[in-house]
Amino acid sequence: MPKEGKKLQEARKQFDKNTLYEPLEALEMVKKTATAKFDETVEVAFRLGVDPRHADQQLRGAVVLPHGTGKTKTVLVFAKGDKAKEAEAAGADFVGAEDMLEKIQGGWLGFDVAIATPDMMGTVGRLGRVLGPRGLMPNPKTGTVTFEVGDAVRDAKGGKITYRTDKVGIIHAPIGKASFDTQKLAENFKTLADTLVRIKPASAKGTYMKTITVSSTMGPGVRINPNKL
């Protein structure tokens, strides 16, 4: 196991790793311990009482954070005709059809989000091996397969994030930057937490919100009390 750096060791001394903090307090600590020379991303990890081996307990979706993530996303839209024009008008960075398919097959991946109209999925589906492993494949569950391409582009540009349980039932997601005001981080956190509470699977047994940990890119994790949401 790699040895911790001095900065991380010093950061850990600023709080009790065994204490469960209220969200606002935890986020203030994360901001204080974000000492890297770049604007660190603030991330949250929810360990949920779900069993991802069961399809109905595999959580996946998207939510628009009220204050965005602090990252400008490059958006690609697969569409034709009027829908292509709608996507361009909404601010999509790249819009196309078969031409974009060929570009991606040639190795180009200069985008963060891919959106497609349903009629284009026959074409886009051929990119599954390229886009799937990178989390870039358009999917109805995340609102990226839709005829409402204008809304989808605006959401993606305006702070929409996707979430998905991993193999052990943890959801990792960014909720902003360390430079954000604490209150804005707290509101982004609450939006995501409320969404996860709302979509709790009916078949989930026992405690649903098991642990919540928030941290900056290079900082230590601070635990949030799930009962204080």
Swiss-Prot record:
Record carries keyword Ribosomal protein: yes
Record GO terms (molecular function): rRNA binding; structural constituent of ribosome; tRNA binding
Record keywords: Repressor, Ribonucleoprotein, Ribosomal protein, RNA-binding, rRNA-binding, Translation regulation, tRNA-binding
GO CC annotation, single: large ribosomal subunit
Disulfide bridge positions per record: none
Function as written in the Swiss-Prot or TrEMBL entry: Binds directly to 23S rRNA. The L1 stalk is quite mobile in the ribosome, and is involved in E site tRNA release. Protein L1 is also a translational repressor protein, it controls the translation of the L11 operon by binding to its mRNA.
Family matches, as NCBIfam families: rplA_bact
Similarity annotation: Belongs to the universal ribosomal protein uL1 family.
Protein name listed in UniProt: Large ribosomal subunit protein uL1
Organism: Desulforamulus reducens (strain ATCC BAA-1160 / DSM 100696 / MI-1)
